Amino acid sequence: MIDKVFVCSDHWWVNANEKILSHLEKKYPQIVAYSFWPKDENEKVDYPDMAKVVCKNILEFQDSIWILICWTGQWINMSANKVEWIRSWVVNDSYSAQMIKEHNNANVICFWAREWLFKSYKKLIDIFLSTEFEWGRHLQRVEKVTHQYMNNI
């Protein structure tokens, strides 16, 4: 069961962290939520650095997920997936939010930084958090991808 959620955005949407944390605290009081940089929009953060730091923490907190936000969502996703054991996706719809967890056991969910999409992000986060990994044949696939990564294939 997920017991910690970490939220991190780059400088494009600084207040996203607080909005998402507020939603998590109201809806999931059993989950401890943390926020990482930046403190204001003047503090520039490069997404590769951000992804490296936050994704390394997943190894320390096994039952956790990360919510990452950057201008496109794609660059932070790509950077996150360079870190071993990370399974990250950009999510734009309900089906993807469910399937990345159910079939791929995703531990990072990424969004693009747009204020007007915040309501849909709350819904997608809720779907993601309420979905369980199905194991079975899906575990074999996740292990194959991990093996390919570890062997640089």
Residue spans for each PLM region:
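Short, conserved beta-strand edge motifs with alternating hydrophobic and charged residues
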Residues: C8, A33-W37, W66-C70
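Solvent-exposed polar/charged
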Residues: K26, N81-K82, E102
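A short beta-strand-loop structural module common to alpha/beta enzyme folds
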Residues: Q30-K44
